[in-house]
From Swiss-Prot:
GO molecular function, one term: metal ion binding
Domain of life per record: Eukaryota
Entry annotated with the keyword Ubl conjugation: no
GO cellular component terms, A-Z: mitochondrion
NCBIfam families in UniProt: yjeF_nterm (TIGR00197)
InterPro entries: YjeF_N_dom (IPR004443), YjeF_N_dom_sf (IPR036652), YJEFN_prot_NAXE-like (IPR032976)
EC class of the enzyme, as a word: isomerase
Organism expressing this protein natively: Drosophila sechellia
Catalytic reaction annotation: (6R)-NADHX = (6S)-NADHX; (6R)-NADPHX = (6S)-NADPHX
Family: Belongs to the NnrE/AIBP family.
Pfam families, per database record: YjeF_N (PF03853)
Annotated HAMAP family: NADHX_epimerase
Identification of the protein by name: NAD(P)H-hydrate epimerase
EC number: 5.1.99.6
């Protein structure tokens, strides 16, 4: 059977079942999701060639995944720098930020220009918006979305390329075009429009009964891998 691509309503329902029926906590799933993102990045963009990563984090859970990924990427030998224009004032996100600070992961307060990003980084990790995003992009994030639209650096997007509609995908021809898309839990409908080189599935935590209920038809993760190529 074919892999299922989730619409927005289904993606929210799966998440809610993980929280309510299976009693996963947000921080538990965020840690597993962010770790799988770091592993997918490492498979596609080895630290030897792409050591400097600009990690762009949004205000919600997608941004939290980015903070987790930054911490694990640092442990894998990368040099991540975090751009977090609108930090979330909740203990979970404050703790994730604190962990990055304690690991001497730098952050920048201003969005880099296209020129400075090309000079200072080898890759951008796009962890701005998740499947709850609805256009238009808010003012706090316009500059970083424009950076990702204009840069020649490779981009790795977490779950949804920033600015894309979760179901319709790209809304304009100048939308973000990632080289790597890391779908989490299950791919969303917008992933059908993805034309980049690498598409991975991460978040190896979906209980078999939940997979059957939603007919997700997820691929088998090889061995002890935390992500699988789609």
């Amino acid at each position: 059977m074919d892999l299922k691509y989730l619409n927005q309503k289904e993606a929210i329902a799966v998440d809610q079942e993980l929280f309510n029926e299976y009693k996963f906590s947000v921080d538990q799933l965020m840690e597993l999701a962010g770790l799988s993102c770091a592993h997918a990045v490492a498979k596609c963009f080895p630290a030897e060639k792409h050591p400097r990563i600009l990690v762009c984090c949004g205000p919600g859970n997608n941004g939290g995944d980015g903070l987790v990924a930054a911490r694990h990427l640092a442990l894998m030998g990368y040099t991540p720098t975090i751009y977090y224009p609108k930090p979330t004032a909740k203990p979970l996100f404050e703790n994730l930020s604190h962990q990055c600070q304690q690991m001497d992961i730098c952050d920048v307060k201003e969005c880099p220009s296209v020129e400075s990003a090309a000079r200072d980084y080898d890759l951008i990790l796009d962890a701005l918006f998740g499947f709850s995003f609805k256009p238009p992009v808010r003012a706090d994030f316009v500059a970083v979305v424009e950076l990702m639209q204009q840069t020649k650096l490779p981009i790795a997007s977490v779950d949804i390329p920033s600015g894309w509609d979760v179901e319709k995908g790209k809304l304009t021809e100048c939308d973000v075009e990632p080289a790597l898309l890391i779908s989490l839990t299950a791919p969303k409908l917008c992933a059908r429009q993805f034309r980049g080189e690498h598409h991975y599935l991460g978040g190896r935590f979906v209980p078999p009964a939940l997979q059957r209920k939603y007919e997700l038809n997820l691929p088998v993760y090889p061995g002890n891998e935390l992500c699988v190529k789609l």
